[in-house]
Amino acid sequence: MVAPSLPHSNRLSFDDGVALQEHFHAQGWTDGLPIVPPTTDAVAACLDWAALPADHLIGVEPVRGRAITAEKVAINSVMAGCLPSHFPVVVTAVTAMLAEPFLLHGATASTGGCGVLVVVNGPIRHEIGMSSGFNAVGPSDRASTCIGRAVRLVLGNLLEVRPGEIDRSTLGHPGKISFCIAEDEEQTPWASLAAERIGDPYVSAVTVMAAMGPRQLMNEWTTEPAEILDTFVAEIKANMRHYSIWAGNYAVVIPPQLRAHFDTAGWSKADVREYVFEHARIRRGEWAGVGKRSAVGEKGEHTYAALTEPDDLLVIAAGGPAGGFGAVIPPWLGTTSRAITVPVGACIDC
């Protein structure tokens, strides 16, 4: 196998900040929002924080063979507004996306319009000021917003994942600008997502998932875990009818008010996953009721599950303290892309 050639960065100079912004916009290097100038010092600060040389190869995009270096990721992290302390999380998210089971090219080139959900676990959440509470799935804090945005800028500027170029999304969704969540590990007896997926409850880690936009739900009328989960299941089944029937990595976000009912009843994350696995199923014939009769064919009585196994479900503890709300985050296209979890500082192919 021929080693990929490493990209080199050009040094640019501008008369003023307005000229810089307009040049970056004109080149298609932004997401439509203003960027932070990626000065030599700012980029070097990110690299120094992570102890990475500029030409360190973070990975190679498996389909197109594009080499992604630490310097290129640092440039886009600075542009997104990241501090140097945020940079290791961005590097880890990029590392996870480059894993072959994630199918980065397919997910980012599809007309389906998915974004990249980034979930952060471990001590680094507090070290960089991430919030797991109010507005957890929206703009909640600087670190979450900038890390999610950095991931998008990396895709656009290093892999041409821009609308009308590699990105062929028919609609897309707002999470494609930034979609980063820190899990609430303190206000729950549940094991963290990272602890469940890599077996270490103390490590800082990042999980990435090719995800559609969140579907918010509410159930304040029961304290029974099964009834609460029936609402989540109904949302998953609606996605199977309206969008994609194929099983994959669904994520559910459960805030404190609902989590308290699970805690009182002694339900673990494993119990949640098992219940959803058993109940989130539809018959193909149900497509007839949502205008897809011609796609039913002779498989009307065939049953499809949302998950291939219980562990396909990502259960994320996050959200503000009040309100019986939750969210289902559907996968892009079933098992075509798999969620990937990587410890901060790890290298998949080393």
Predicted features and spans:
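Non-transmembrane, aqueous-exposed alpha-helical and coiled segments at domain scale
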Residues: 1-350
